[in-house]
Amino acid sequence: MYNLLWKKIILIFVVSFIVVECSAQREQYRSQHDDLPYYFGATLGYNLSYLSAKKSEKFLAEDSILVAEPAASGGVTIGLQATFKLTKRLQARFNPLIVLGGARYFNYTLNSKYNTNEPIEQRYTLPTTVLSLPVSIKFNSDRIDNFRTYLLFGVKADVDLSANSTARNQEGYIKLKKYNYGVEAGVGFNLFLKFFTLTPELKISYGVNNILDREPNLKYSAVFESIQSRMIMFSLHFED
């Protein structure tokens, strides 16, 4: 935990140093960049994901399971991007990403009166690797020297590449759907350096469809009516 905190602090200082350096720079780097009809880049980031669940009537009516809570862990994000100029202030961006190392968890507390042959505390882990395909519109501010901010809004389609894995399809496990759709919003800023543009970005994603593949006869699945995904992502874009 402390290592992660120190990494975040160091990252903030590094980004702040670059901002100061760019702001102090009199010479405007890559001054013709805004005239490009399109440009490409690469993305490296980290995401914090979680699941929002609605309990079913079965869970409320019965007490064989006392607690049922979903959770999820973060993962490393890598990808490519293509950005296209629409107007002076508007750009369209396609940013396909692979989210690696994440997992989704389901924690249960069973009622000992009805579950004498099972541990009271249960956890089901579903390894997850996701292909994310977001399409976004960027609203750019005016450029000040080598610095510019922007707002971002868009939609995305996610494909769970682990959905058909053996670990995800064991008998009795809760199952999630392969496809997920959502909306996104974010904020970022461009730091125009001598040979490339560094773009830190913070984005939130809100899944709109139910990703639970509900099985009424499976007690670990039947306690949920619906599950939706949520994500917060910090990214560094390296743009040409």
PLM region descriptions:
Residues 22-75, 239:
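Short glycine/proline- and aromatic-enriched beta-strand/turn motifs that initiate or cap beta-hairpins
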Residues 29, 178, 189-240:
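Predominantly the C-terminal beta-signal and adjacent terminal strand-loop region
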Residues 35, 85-87, 142-146, 192-194, ...:
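Outer-membrane beta-barrel channels and translocator barrels
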Residues 36-40, 72-76, 127-131, 147, ...:
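Residues that define the transmembrane beta-barrel architecture of outer-membrane proteins
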Residues 38-44, 92-96, 131-133, 149-155, ...:
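Transmembrane beta-strands of outer-membrane beta-barrel proteins
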Residues 46-50, 98-102, 155-163, 204-210, ...:
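Transmembrane beta-strands of outer-membrane beta-barrel pores
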Residues 50, 89-92, 145, 195-198:
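Repeated loop/turn-to-beta-strand initiation elements of outer-membrane beta-barrel proteins
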Residues 54-69, 102-128, 161-176, 211-225:
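Flexible, solvent-exposed loop segments that connect beta-strands
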